[in-house]
Amino acid sequence: MKKFFALALVAPLLISCSSSTKKGDTYNEAWVKDTNGFDILMGQFAHNIENLWGFKEVLIAGPKDYVKYTDQYQTRSHINFDDGTITVETIAGTEPAAHLRRAIIKTLLMGDDPGSVDLYSDVDDIQISREPFLYGQVVDNTGQPIRWEGRATNFADYLLKTRLKSRSNGLRIIYSVTINLVPNHLDKRAHKYVGMVRQAARKYGVDESLILAIMQTESSFNPYAVSRSDALGLMQVVQHTAGKDVFRSQGKSGTPGRSFLFDPASNIDTGTAYLAMLNNVYLGGIDNPTSRRYAVITAYNGGAGSVLRVFSNDKVQAANIINSMSPGDVYQTLTTRHPSAESRRYLYKVNATQKSYRRK
């Protein structure tokens, strides 16, 4: 309640974040209310950041961006998992180097428990871990991975001496330090979850390469991943759609909680269970496994109903039409005629990424 109250009080604001469609076709009133409330709070949060940092300086956590504010929103750490960079910045008017130093150390040594960190408040709730999430993904100025506080502190001091930059937003001076992740940072993150992926793949009969491709496309293996539609975790599961469908299929009532979906193993299990539901239930009428895979991938992003409606408003007729087409024609149709540009691109991205995992 304390964290929610802090967010609710974050006054005035802007709107900015990556779009993400709701996974699944179950849209109920409770989901709409929750989403509208979340949108309002996100708008307030963004507006507060704009007031402090400036119009072009709004940064909010997303599926592939870890953003954490501290020091009354005057300091922030941003990990861009696509670009492979860590940027720590502050607008603190006094002792900016000290603020940066603390944030650098905390970011380098933070654990991989997203449920313990509130990305929408300035509470300094980042716990230093003996198994840092970024261990092996970043090395210090001597080329060594960073596990202990002493090494992180020395590296922070080195960065402040050699890489400190400043710029003006028109109102304040922004001091920053940028650190590059190692070139194979994506593979290092993916490796953390291979065992969980293998277990879920066997449990639900889903190809490991598809699960990994979905994870890379959705979150770039960022366990802290959130979206504007409140999709959570590595596979970007929405509680009130895909999450609820999976719980219902497993004989559970209600919806999975945020802490449940922020747990990597639970998130991967739920996302994979939903892929199996799409494959075996919602799109089970598609005979050709390759055509069905294309449909499942697209449906994971935009829903099974929207996939079938590309071919016909009648679900049975849609499946019959798909069954009369070659897999190549199904792919071409979904990547050119699906009403959502995001879903069209999604199939292209996931299919290409899955091919790369099959070659490994």
From Swiss-Prot:
Has the keyword Lyase been applied to this entry? Answer: yes
First and last residue of the signal peptide: 1-16
Which protein, by its recorded name, is this?
Membrane-bound lytic murein transglycosylase C
What family, per the record? Belongs to the transglycosylase Slt family.
Note the Pfam families from the entry: Mltc_N, SLT
Record's HAMAP family?
MltC (MF_01616)
Q: Which reaction does it catalyse?
A: Exolytic cleavage of the (1->4)-beta-glycosidic linkage between N-acetylmuramic acid (MurNAc) and N-acetylglucosamine (GlcNAc) residues in peptidoglycan, from either the reducing or the non-reducing ends of the peptidoglycan chains, with concomitant formation of a 1,6-anhydrobond in the MurNAc residue
The record's top EC class is lyase
Q: S-diacylglycerol cysteine: lipidated where?
A: C17
The organism's lineage?
Answer: Bacteria, Pseudomonadati, Pseudomonadota, Gammaproteobacteria, Enterobacterales
Q: Please provide the Gene Ontology terms (biological process) for this protein.
A: cell wall macromolecule catabolic process; cell wall organization; peptidoglycan metabolic process
**Which species does this protein come from?**
Citrobacter koseri (strain ATCC BAA-895 / CDC 4225-83 / SGSC4696)
Q: Could you tell me the superkingdom of the organism this chain comes from? A: Bacteria
GO CC: one term?
A: cell outer membrane
Q: What is its EC number?
A: 4.2.2.n1
Asked if the keyword DNA damage belongs to this entry, the reply reads no
| Cell compartments where the protein resides | Cell outer membrane
